[in-house]
């Protein structure tokens, strides 16, 4: 017999086996589980921290085996087959959605051909270093584009609340298979870190090639190849090698679009082919707020010393719109995530140790389609696709941020000065590289966004006393939390509603947010492709 139980410990009791066993036995009695002298074997499943009160508690969950031995491994089996030549599937994008789609295809021996505009991890790391130290941006290989997608060099956070979308444990298990620490299988908020994730992505890509798949780096998808009989159908893609300039046509049985939230050219490509395949969706924009780590730790841990950096999650409703923290990076860094030279875009990341001197989070507010100014709707309509209005507006805000910056030095303002609407004569030390420049965010950010952020920060300070302080720094602008465009797909077949054999997938298509949910969507879409090919 087996059952699952939860116990509560103090941090000092976490490694006290006698205390743990006593609490487990007590929980079994409380749940009226009959053990009758049988051997009890607990297997640890998950840990989370409850820091809501002054006395911090650890919530530990166990699977308890009563009178039987634990299973050797109750994780999913990974059965990959070498690709056959019978079927081929093109995957545009090598982020988590694309990679996990590829591994799902290997379960049926189907060959994936991955098209990736950016560099493999080692060269991509060089591109990123040049951006941070010299301010030089490679528009196709950066924090957003390249091997492993945006998450490879921007945090490696795996936590998702979208567990109903797929088997998240299988997602974690595959990461562990390629070198991720096993604790991601049990942590409540699993995190790999940008110092470890590139090696894991390398191992994944090596396996894809070993199994007979292909990965084409530095290769841009420039167009779909379509044919029309009864309906429009995608049969391949046109590509361009960004190093040699060579153009090529690649044909396949199906195409999975897993391009991420920053591939504006893909939306514009689809708008030319079939504008009704796109729809506008709600997204969010705002700023990064960065504190010295010790301030957040003191607030969240009530002055107690803990080995890890503290996290937080904040939400508010202001003027009928949500304002919330996103991608909180304890012990992390703020990083530049623009994909064009005339943009400033920021994001956050942490290494596996989460041990920098700062903690940061995006603070963003909803931007619904009806919030987009009419001039952008008119521009998108004139260009044949009204659904792109939010994308045009987002680009405008990123350009506006650049115009209030100094090259890749991001505009910044102390949080207290933002609330008081005054100049920041000095700025606190920051993790952001290349650097920051003092700017009146309160003057040039769109008024509705500024007002909502100001009101939300005051509300957040009620929940986290000391959140508003002179050392807190706002860095603009955070605009890539999600895409403003959705590529429409059928709820059952997951095929694009307007273009047959085209399968929108992941964050860039509007169906996920973050590594975990994107990987699950990749598996889900690949399963739909497999079902289609079996018919």
Predicted regions and their residues:
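Residues forming the flavin
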Residues: 1-58, 62-153, 157-174, 178-535
